[in-house]
A protein has these predicted regions:
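Walker A/P-loop nucleotide-binding motif
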Residues: 82-104
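AAA+/P-loop NTPase substrate/partner-engagement loops
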Residues: 108-152
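Pre-Walker A adenine-sensing motif
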Residues: 67-81
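Interdomain "pre-motor" coupling segment immediately N-terminal to P-loop NTPase/helicase cores
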Residues: 1-50
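Dynamic helix-loop-helix/coil hinge segments at AAA+ ATPase domain boundaries and subdomain interfaces
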Residues: 2-5, 47-71
């Protein structure tokens, strides 16, 4: 074996070992398993896990949030119809209905292809991989981060 062939063989061996430890892009889940998914890290790689028991919150049951509900409903209707829609940031104290509004919209529009992916704040760095995973899907996805608070220094 020549020096060049030896070098190539060693380089291929090194690459194989590196590929084994580097994180892989998330694999596609069983999209029919749920209308909601959670992004989780498993062994250094991201995975979308189906949410087995999606909250059955309905928009009609949410009170004292009429202006927010109307805006979110209108925006989500546009989004699932494939029209321009705005990104949404709901702010407020704990227990004011932010998450409930999102889950109620999911239930309202799931039959029209709306899906939800919950991502922890620490995993937002993987957002490009998640977007790549869903880019060619026919469904419309809400990326949902339930606790996006920022501490001093972040």
């Amino acid at each position: 074996m020549s020096d060049v062939q030896t070098l190539i063989a060693r380089a291929e061996s090194l690459l194989a070992r590196l590929e084994a430890v580097l994180p892989h892009p998330p694999a596609a889940p069983d999209w029919a398993a749920s209308i909601a998914f959670r992004y989780r890290k498993r062994a250094g790689s991201g995975v979308l896990e189906p949410v087995r028991h999606v909250a059955t919150i309905r928009l009609e049951s949410l009170v004292e949030v009429a202006p927010q509900k109307e805006r979110l409903l209108r925006n989500t209707e546009q989004f699932v119809a494939g029209h321009g829609a705005n990104n949404v940031l709901l702010t407020g104290a704990r227990g004011t209905g932010k998450s409930s509004l999102i889950k109620a919209c999911l239930n309202q529009f799931a039959s029209q292809g709306l899906r939800l992916i919950e991502v922890d704040k620490a995993d937002l760095v993987d957002l490009p991989d998640i977007v790549d995973l869903v880019a060619d899907r026919p469904e419309r996805f809400i990326v949902f981060c339930d606790d996006l608070s920022f501490d001093e220094g972040e």
